[in-house]
């Protein structure tokens, strides 16, 4: 779900960019968010995902492989950040997601029986699940491609934001806005999936382009601090209090945080029964989440044999397509990445 602050973000705080804007910049991508996008977007006409001969889903690997190569061809230094163990207070949201997916599976089966291909595709996308096996396969593929990834101790967006704050990454990338609450100086949206996309439940297609939101510009436009932004998110609803506070929408929440300059006192004054957990605990989590400095960002030459083994021999990908893509990846590495690496202290803070 993530926190949805889109409604209160002024147009002047959102900058539409092209991929050239990110050339030679390190972008920390929320891996789970990207993989879910690949799982939902890369599907057959009837809504079923791509699969190999053993019935194993491969949409996530296809998206990860080809999209990563495309980004690297633009000289973008991609690093994927994977979620670790979620905090206990996320339990309600996790259970809600399970219920939504289970219901979507039932509706998908009903749509298939009725021959309603549009509905079947929609519900199939909603039912997409990312398994531990899929995540491990993604990590193995990234290793073979020479692309770095980081294992977060908890929330991937918190880790990506931390990396951006300390200068190891230029921006965090996700469809959700949580990384802004976690303090990322920049958020890039629409990076994993761009191009012409169909709007949900409509026969309308729009051109999706990357967006850049800078935290300082956003806070200045709203006239609030990051701490107030966190309080605003909690009022609306986050992964740790999915329902937010009854009767409070984004615009009302913004008025409240601006009227109460102290976000702690504002949260303390809210009815406790509105929250599944202490709102101050949620507030503190956004400001000081578990993160790690145990990572090294290094872009290596791809291991062609290993990539072939994973995709072609392991998952029935087209040998010719993989071979051609590997040539593109090798060229991108030679042109943009050879000798490029960043250690734990980011070149001693540059």
UniProtKB/Swiss-Prot annotation:
Entries under SMART domains matching the protein: HhH2, XPGI, XPGN
Note on how the cofactor is bound: Binds 2 magnesium ions per subunit. They probably participate in the reaction catalyzed by the enzyme. May bind an additional third magnesium ion after substrate binding.
Task performed by this protein: Structure-specific nuclease with 5'-flap endonuclease and 5'-3' exonuclease activities involved in DNA replication and repair. During DNA replication, cleaves the 5'-overhanging flap structure that is generated by displacement synthesis when DNA polymerase encounters the 5'-end of a downstream Okazaki fragment. Binds the unpaired 3'-DNA end and kinks the DNA to facilitate 5' cleavage specificity. Cleaves one nucleotide into the double-stranded DNA from the junction in flap DNA, leaving a nick for ligation. Also involved in the base excision repair (BER) pathway.
GO terms, biological process: DNA repair; DNA replication, removal of RNA primer
CDD domains: H3TH_FEN1-Arc, PIN_FEN1
HAMAP family cross-referenced by the UniProt entry: Fen
Oligomeric and partner information: Interacts with PCNA. PCNA stimulates the nuclease activity without altering cleavage specificity.
Top EC class, one word: hydrolase
PANTHER family, alphabetized: FLAP ENDONUCLEASE 1, FLAP ENDONUCLEASE FAMILY MEMBER
Highest taxon in the source lineage: Archaea
Coiled-coil stretches: none
E.C. designation(s): 3.1.-.-
Region feature N-domain, mapped onto this chain: 1-101
Positions of region (Interaction with PCNA): 340-348
Positions of region (I-domain): 119-261
Pfam hit, one: XPG_I
Full protein name: Flap endonuclease 1
